[in-house]
């Protein structure tokens, strides 16, 4: 297969998926233990992540730094229609100037400000998918 054909085929697949967002629902968890099984699954070979999104690292960071700074867990897990996890956002919630703000766990110490992704979803995610994710999260806030 030539490179142009491979790119064209991949683009066609992505466009077919983009007519409707693939993130059907989100869970927002306030407890790391409740997120651990999905989180560790997204650390597997089918996922895209960095060492800075690993459960063990961020659990330790939250216990030492996050807790001292008054941060609460705000773990977002996005699921497809079969309840298969597509992504996990390891976020922390804080109060700032009267507003609730979320940011990636790790703060200024260790983070690339990114989610853990199912590899296939990450490779083909569209703006429709991400806009849908933001809409679903906003319904929980």
What positions do the PLM features span?
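N-acyltransferase acceptor-side catalytic subdomain
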Residues: 1-141
